[in-house]
Amino acid sequence: MVNKLEQELTQKLEILLKQTALSISDQQKNKLVQLVLLLNKWNKAYNLTSVRDPMEMLIKHILDSVVVSPYLQGDLFIDVGTGPGLPGLPLAIINPDKNFVLLDSLGKRISFIRNAVRELELSNVVPVLSRVEEYIPDHKFDGILSRAFAILKDMTDWCHHLPNEKGLFYALKGVYQQEEVMDMSNNFQVIDVIKLHVPELIGERHLVKVKKM
């Protein structure tokens, strides 16, 4: 039986998605709503996010993650400092043909992600409990995703060992600061800065794509 909150989230998600160019199946929409419900439930006990309102989670966590989807190139991605699986889990839900490693150093976050993977039957997600500098992957990645790093230099310094030859860094950021680029090592180059439209989100959002030279 669908409860009132689930119904409201489903309706709200439909409204939000209509303001984007994303094409998402009904099953995927349902999984995104279930993810919000799970996050809301776990958050009460484990304090996984400062966002308390499920409707707000839909905008600040789900939509903010999925709008990046059209820009992803490749099949194998790692979300570094994923927290409660953001942007990795929403992206995995709407990209069943791509594989995602979700990395975080905090046990309660990885426990939540493992639970979400099980509940939502996500066969394309591997949760990993580790600090990024200690993580040695079996395969290098097509894309390194993160919304956890305050500055680009930190992301490229900490994650330099993760991309494959053609792999890219995808930094999800608020306001784009040109100064950040100046601070980066010469081994890295910004190849694109995309202004993202996240429906009903106050403030700027950007996707910064970086490649290793």
UniProtKB/Swiss-Prot annotation:
- Kindly state which keywords UniProt assigns to this record, in alphabetical order: Cytoplasm, Methyltransferase, rRNA processing, S-adenosyl-L-methionine, Transferase
Disulphide bond pairs = none
Localisation: Cytoplasm
Catalysed reaction(s) here are: guanosine(527) in 16S rRNA + S-adenosyl-L-methionine = N(7)-methylguanosine(527) in 16S rRNA + S-adenosyl-L-homocysteine
For this record, the Gene Ontology CC terms, alphabetical, are: cytosol
Q: What is its EC number?
A: 2.1.1.170
Q: What molecular function terms (GO) are annotated for this protein?
A: rRNA (guanine-N7-)-methyltransferase activity
Keyword set includes Glycosyltransferase: no
The protein's job, in short, is: Specifically methylates the N7 position of guanine in position 527 of 16S rRNA.
What protein name is recorded for this chain?
Ribosomal RNA small subunit methyltransferase G
